[in-house]
Each structure stands twice: as C-alpha cells, then as structure tokens.
Amino acid sequence: LYEVYQNKEDLLYEVVVMNDKRKKEEIEKFDKPGLNVINIVMHVLRLQTEEFNRVNPLFYEELGRYPKLRIYFADRENKEHEQLVDFIERGVDEGYFLSNIDINLYSSLTAASGDYIMANFLYNKCNYKEILKTFILLYIRSICTEKGIKLLDKEMADFF
C-alpha cells in the first residue's frame, strides 16, 4: 500500500473520495423519471444504513484525525448544502415538502445533528436504525406536506 500511498492519510483520503463518488453515481442512477424526493431520501438512507453496517465505527472515528480529510469534509459539507437547497426546492415543486422552510437554518440544524451523532459516538450507544428513524422523524417528516407525510410513513413502514 505504501508504494502507492505515502501515508495513511493519503490512503484514507482516496478511500473516502472514491466512496463518495460511488455513492453519488448510485444515487444519480437511482433517480429516474417517476421517482420523487421521498423515494430518493429513503433510498439514500438505505444505502447509508448498509454502509454503516459494513464499516467498523472505528473507521469513522479515525477519519477526523487527519487535516486533509477535515478539509475535504468541510468542502463536502458546503457542496451538500447547495445540493440540499436544490433538493428541497424540488420537493416543494413536487408537493412533498413545505414551501415555508428556511433552508439555510434547516441545513445548519441537520449538519449539526450529524456532527453531534459522530462526535459523541451516539452510534455506539444507540441502535443505528433507531438513530436514523428519529432523524427522519425530526428532519424529514417535519418538513413534509400531508402528501409527503403519507408517502414517507409508507416508505418508513417498509424500511423499519
């Protein structure tokens, strides 16, 4: 490995970048005509659950120790904010999300919750699916219209 990568930080960086690229491609492949934001949210959460079940939590804990990765994650968070704005606007247009959402505040709150979960190793104290279910109820269901709630509840019943 160290013939290709000079140090562990470079290796981890490449793994994270490649994994992010793979996830992005999978989501883009999934998003076909006829699907909506609720379908996509649940698909992404399924992928995250599968990944979390495959990866040792120590891996996630290790990532925050490297400056190059911290910079990458900060840049990724900015890009994800832009994608979130577009995604919520799409959900509003589709009639699944409320139109009176302060997207910047919403984005900050969801990011802070994710950071809290990781920084406090909540996944070691609670079942990951319970964390996910609570996250969905707090941050997805709360911005749904009645139409969105009905579909989300159905999707959640199938998932949980």
Report residues per predicted region.
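HTH DNA-binding helix-turn interface
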Residues: 1-14
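Hydrophobic alpha-helical bundle segments that form small-molecule/ligand-binding pockets
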Residues: 78-113, 117, 121-123, 146
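Hydrophobic alpha-helical connector segments
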Residues: 14, 18-21, 25-54, 107-110
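Amphipathic, non-transmembrane alpha-helical scaffold segments
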Residues: 12, 16, 20, 70-81, ...
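Short secondary-structure transition hinges
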Residues: 49-96
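Secondary-structure edge/capping motif, primarily at the C-terminal ends of alpha-helices
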Residues: 30, 59-63, 117, 121
